[in-house]
Amino acid sequence: MSQSVKIEGSLLAKNTVLNFIGQVVPLFVAVITIPFIIQGLGADRFGILSLAWIIIGYFSILNLGLGRATTKFVAEALGKDEMEKIPAIVWTSLASQLFLGILGGVILIILTPILVKQILNIPIDLIKETKTTFYLLSLSIPVVICSASLRGVLEAAQRFDLVNAIKIPSSCLNFLLPLIGVFLGFRLPGIIILLLISRIGTMMAYLILCFHVYPKIRKVFLINIQFFRPLFSFGGWITICNILIPILVYLDRFFIGTVCPIAYVGYYSVCYDVLSRLGIFPGSFAMTLFPAFSTLESNKYKLKCLYVCSLKYMLLIMGPIILVLVIFAGDILHLWLGSNWASKTTLVFQILAVGIFLNALAQMPANLLDGIGRPDLRAKIFLSYVLPYVALLWFLIIKFGIIGAALAWALRACVELILFFGIVWKIMGLNRAILIENGLLRGVTVYGGIIIMASSTIAVLGKTLLVRGITTAICLILFVLITWRYILDIGDKHTLFLTVSRLGK
């Protein structure tokens, strides 16, 4: 690569779609293959395989955020046209990742006897097989951690076409190889060996593509200790976020199980798990935006415009979906799970849907903070409200049960959005004019008007399915027409047409 990356709307849109596909396809493969894997392995062995997947996920935190740090600093170098820095950034990060991965593997080897014999409830006849499985799994940890950094190098250059060309098949193989192993009569160690070979192949494919995109990486092998501090400083704050986010997201279910009858955990979890699937789109968009924000860090005006537009696009895409889900929540749950379930979870579903929407919007300023090298601000926001949130969550669950849990989750998402937006507003020097210029203010106004129109019409005419259906259809048609006429500018429309035409080809 001889020149810096040019950040364009059509490129970001195409990459978002690619990332979306990259998350959806393996999900479908998992849904299809898992029943056959369970049938072939049996419940106990499948449980151990599931633990192996979880362990790889947890040990990946040992990369200390260096994968995201690599993406940030390579993208920043591209934005400043400082190509000579990239080999040192990449090799320094990889060396660090390799060391941490080996350390993680050694830790797993040491912990395996304790995990298998004392902590996990493993059947006696499977203890030896489980130990062998975990020992083999330890070899995967450095491979998985290094792969994350190499993938991040490609993401920095907005080469999500190459990333997903590797990521989609490798993610699918995570489920297909156990199925193949079952048909071949393999036990768990054999399946783990197949997965290890696949992961090594994935890592090598990423490395070869990095050599292709950045030829200097192949020619210049350089580990520069000057990069250790910025890499680990950035990655350290990312790690704090990665530790806190699962706690904030999943603590509600633990509290529900403590305060309410255990069945209510299921009522709540089903609503959350279904709605959380909507996070695939903002997650795909955020994955694309992070390196773009880093690349544009030296061009403040373009960075501001991209950030404001990202909020606008998220509002325009997620807003109508959430509106439909809130209006028809009871009908959806009734058809899917029955009237008894719907009566207990409709309001929970509606509140969580609003929370998911606010969380999707909050991902935009959160990614901007990471992109401009301020993940410390994101981590400090999480740290500032974690204890008040825990107290509020506990109080609301005691007072209102699972409705209180949903309310606490949505309030947390709202506070998060306000804090992230406020900090970005201040440090980026945003103003009302740039919100108007890029259509965000009009988008918020129109969406708010549509919500008021829909809710007031339903309140006056009644909540029958016919009234709600006609009202929703009219509101959505108006929203689309107004959006096309007054919110999307010429550049947005050109990007939309170009993206559709590219995908069509």
Please identify what each model-predicted range represents:
Residues M1-L12, Y206-V249, E297-C305, K426-R442, ...:
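Interhelical loop/hinge segments that connect adjacent transmembrane helices in multipass membrane
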Residues L64-K80, L94, A156, Y214-K216, ...:
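Helix-loop junctions and terminal segments of transmembrane helices
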Residues I166-V213, P230, F234, L383-P388, ...:
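Hydrophobic alpha-helical transmembrane segments
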